[in-house]
């Protein structure tokens, strides 16, 4: 770092050349103007220059990192690089950030009549501790995002100043926001909402159809997004896309999107070993689609789903590992029930109700609820945990039976612990239906048996009391082509 001190200079010119520069102007107490030129990246410290009113870096082509400016600095122009600075002035300011992907933070309450132009590029206007005063009859405030995909912090916007924001395409919801009506932003056409950090809860309303949520930060606070007319619609859609960066990074969102029937999630990002997490609250949810190549942990808040409609969670196109927990989904009464599909990675699915599951490729784990279901593991060494799916009724005619469609070598079937004996039972002439077959199979306590009936294979684990009971467990394996000669049973886990 180069330190320059001139106690008498009123104007300073810096030519940034070479690869990059770091300059400290501490002690140049009389400086009122600073001109920056050159093509090198420059990091500048000038925060203690209490008389510095103007910074003109419009001729600079390198990235300018100016830090927090002094409260006296009210005129700032930067050039074509990716520039970063924080405004600390409370008076009227004039800012032109030029071209480049610039980031400007407001660290103070700027006065009415201020003009901020972010210029060309994908720019961001963030809130620090500052706000923007509304226009008055003789002082018009204009905040212009300019060309490009520009983002503004929602915490800077209120009913009084919303129309002053021009040409912004994205609204950042990271900082706490209380029920902002985005329809008030009449001079901007929003294309996206963003979560870039981890500061607090936010609520926005009147979000237009087609606007999505981009998640690059880690925010566990609730982000409530009220899409316009979703409460009365029957086929409303919303999408969440993770686009965070950094190896071994974590990105998360907790979204409330009540009224949305169709939710799509893209679990993506730039970097290796990225882990994304999404929590969903949506009382109308019927279809949730997952794509992307990054790991995603998905869960739900209580009350999500509509009992009178079936629900499908379709992650079959995803190549990142999916961890899906349906514990808090509403119990679906529609005959279509709950369907879960996952993709080609090693996925884990935890169920709270009867479900149909196709786990795709990968070494997957399916954890059934007490209501059982029909489960397909797909290619890979899969684990089917049906230990909670007990018969539930001492009458075998009314017993719960879960189905595994593709149990094969390398897979694990986890049942109740019923001793380590696994043997075939031969059906007698007394067996005339499935109920009587189950009765015969459960005669002896603390053993697990298998038999074939009606073109399928059944496994029955007795709970320790002779005779079929509610605590026994029955599983149907689709088809009869199973070779149990080398099968092992230990602590309720059956391995082929």
Briefly describe each language-model feature range.
Residues 1-496:
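Solvent-exposed, low-complexity segments and loops of surface/extracellular structural proteins
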């Amino acid at each position: 770092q180069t330190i320059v001190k001139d106690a008498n200079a009123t104007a300073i010119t810096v030519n940034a050349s070479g690869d990059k520069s770091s300059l400290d102007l501490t002690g140049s107490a009389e400086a009122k103007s600073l001109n920056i030129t050159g093509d090198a990246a420059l990091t500048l410290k000038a925060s203690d220059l209490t008389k510095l009113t103007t910074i003109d870096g419009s001729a600079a082509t390198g990235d300018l990192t100016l830090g927090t400016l002094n409260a006296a600095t009210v005129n700032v122009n930067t050039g074509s690089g990716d520039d970063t600075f924080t405004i600390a002035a409370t008076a009227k300011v004039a800012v032109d950030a030029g071209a480049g992907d610039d980031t400007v933070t407001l660290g103070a309450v700027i006065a009415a009549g201020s003009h901020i132009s972010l210029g060309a590029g994908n720019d961001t206007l963030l809130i620090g501790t500052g706000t923007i005063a509304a226009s008055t009859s003789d002082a018009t405030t204009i905040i212009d995002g300019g060309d490009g995909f520009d983002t503004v912090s929602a915490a800077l916007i209120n009913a009084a100043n919303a129309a002053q924001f021009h040409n912004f395409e994205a609204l950042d919801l990271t900082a706490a926001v209380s029920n902002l009506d985005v329809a008030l932003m009449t001079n901007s056409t929003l294309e996206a909402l963003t979560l870039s950090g981890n500061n607090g809860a936010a609520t926005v309303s009147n979000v237009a159809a087609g606007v999505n949520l981009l998640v690059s930060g880690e925010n566990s606070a609730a982000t409530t997004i009220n899409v316009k007319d979703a409460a009365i619609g029957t086929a409303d859609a919303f999408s969440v896309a993770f686009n965070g960066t950094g190896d071994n990074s974590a990105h998360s969102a907790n979204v409330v999107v009540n009224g949305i029937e169709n939710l799509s999630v893209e679990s993506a990002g730039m970097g290796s070993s990225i882990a994304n997490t999404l929590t969903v609250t949506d009382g109308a949810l019927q279809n949730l689609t997952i794509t992307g190549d990054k790991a995603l942990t998905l869960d739900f808040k209580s009350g999500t789903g509509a009992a009178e409609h079936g629900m499908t969670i379709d992650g079959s196109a995803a190549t990142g590992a999916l961890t899906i927990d349906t514990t808090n989904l509403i119990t679906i009464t529609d005959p279509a029930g709950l369907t879960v599909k996952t993709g080609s990675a090693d996925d884990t699915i935890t169920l709270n109700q009867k479900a149909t599951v196709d786990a795709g490729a990968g070494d997957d784990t399916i954890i059934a609820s007490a209501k059982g279901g029909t489960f397909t593991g797909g290619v890979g060494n899969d684990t089917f945990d049906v230990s909670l799916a007990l018969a539930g009724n001492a009458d075998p005619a009314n017993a719960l039976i879960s189905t595994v469609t593709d149990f094969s070598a390398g897979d694990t079937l986890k049942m109740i612990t019923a001793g380590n004996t696994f043997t075939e039972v031969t059906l007698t002439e007394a067996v005339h239906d499935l109920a009587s077959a189950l009765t015969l199979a459960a005669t002896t306590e603390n053993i697990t048996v298998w038999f074939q009936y009606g073109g399928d294979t059944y496994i029955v684990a007795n709970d320790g009391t002779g005779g079929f009971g509610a605590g026994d467990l029955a599983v149907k394996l689709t088809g009869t082509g199973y070779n149990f000669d080398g099968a092992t049973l230990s602590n309720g886990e059956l391995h082929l």
